[in-house]
Amino acid sequence: MDYIGNKWKKQVVWMLTFCGIDYCSMDSNGRVKLSPKFLEDFTSKGIDVVLHCLPEGAVAVYPEETYLKIRQEREITENRAAGSFLGRQMLRRSGAWSQSERISAQGRITLPQAFREHAGFGSGSQKMVVVGVEIGVELWTPERWNAERQRMEEHDLEKRNQEMQADLNP
């Protein structure tokens, strides 16, 4: 409670979840220890998560309930999937490159070997960048993250230039 004016009022504080960048290591068995901040974000939604390989070459980690909401929004009926190459391909990609995982008591998740290879993590211990994406986190190699960050900055600059040109030349 805070004293505001002449009354006590309860202040609602919105905490940003899954925001920021962190760095961690993955051991030779594929175990990743989450930072206390991201671990708190995940455990506030339960310890069940879904790992999902992204086309950009990273591994996303979502709370299970978040992943299920994402999938429901892109739901494909069984009939549509059976009669559609694109429908089957979408299900194949989601099915093959997603896996349930549970955060251990030590605050770790384990990446399957195929997911490590997809994201460019070699064998043995690896450094990784953990990027908050507001609905979960993404695990990147430092090299791939730097390239992705550069692409985003170039895109933002190009978009700004287009907006300025449109504004200056109506």
Language model region names:
Residues 1-24, 28-29, 37-106, 114-170:
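Flexible "stalk/tail and boundary" regions
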